[in-house]
């Protein structure tokens, strides 16, 4: 029976949830398919000895990291999250990685026992400390000092000879207690953890700090201007916490502008910044717009290749920032780069997009105005802060506000003389007087009850009216029937012929009256027939 071989790559795939969690702690995201591709196909081609099955060897991880973070076209920005996660697994290993980490630092000894001298550091492959590395601290080693802005002088960046690489393992804090020497107190610590991008001489190394910061150009101890390059955490926090240039060019342009002002980056730093925050197509568009902004000696835009290349070169120039001329070139380059960002971020005029910005149901007028102004900046060539555009912005603010606010703003007296600030204040008053959701629910409930009560009352009144009308009609019908019978009876009597003065009403003969009529029968009178009446039941 064969036995399954566990490799670093298969180990990470088997604990992929932990790998994703560690990557998230590094503010990056990793995908399993690309993780396998980079480990087994990409990094072995860097010629640093990376095995296809992966490794937790810190020296090899450091060498791959140098290749990945190389500035310019030789770097691999898309692989940064993956090598940073590999580095975190090796330098701060979880329990399932610790048995595979090699070489493993020596365990710390109790402070009371004399420590054995450590073996001299081996010659190791180059290691860049451009970015922070998480290393287990020794028990007796004090916390490394974080350099302040007034730290020791940095070394010249523009020379081409690389410095000797330091040993990746942290040196011991002191020598053997039986005669070993402690580190001299007067020795200055290494002024920068960014070893791969500094050139020239180096001070004696100390343990790396677990944090790194990017500083602007500053004067060192000898008065020479030096700088600290960007850190990976800064670059990728900027990338992950801001929208893309295509999605919101204004916000990303403002971020890059603040970085250009505070950090005063060199030409190489600008390329690294653009390569991290922009896509390839966005970067080419920005560079093209920046070169269009180059002006000639007459102050007008020029298209002369020599003047454009001198002001905004596409290849690394030989500008020495320690000289006034070099600093002037860098300042002009940053100004052109900012102009390129602003011009490339402008979208074609689209007033329909501006008209599509309407106030939300619970959005304050101030927030709505900011969105409206941002739409003007993004979709039109007009500046909403320009006094000449205040009328257009005011009309858009009125027409595109919430219906209740817009109606009241349109009825304001002397509307044409109102400024945009006046309209916003009036809109805020209307917005603040709106009923709360609880008040609205109570009003709707009360109106519903009142409506039901009115409908019930109206139904009762209609029913009573129908009953009265029915009784009235039946009464009329009954009265008509009774009146008809009476008229028939009375009418029959009235149809008798008129008698003379001496004529008998019974026999119609003259000479006597009916009471004396001999032809009239004598005797008791019979019962009179009763008249039938029509009742409501009939």
UniProtKB/Swiss-Prot annotation:
Result of altering residue 209 to A: Strongly reduced reverse transcription activity
Stated consequence of mutating residue 150 to A: No effect on reverse transcription activity
Motif PTAP/PSAP motif, residue range(s) on this chain: 111-114
Coiled-coil intervals: 438-478
InterPro entries per UniProt: G_retro_matrix, G_retro_matrix_sf, Gag_p12, Gag_P30, Retrov_capsid_N, Retroviral_Gag-Pol_poly, Retrovr_matrix, Znf_CCHC
Motif PPXY motif, chain ranges: 162-165
Disulfide bonds: none
Protein name per the record: Gag polyprotein
Modified residues (Phosphoserine): 192
Gene that this sequence comes from: gag
Result of altering residue 209 to D: Strongly reduced reverse transcription activity
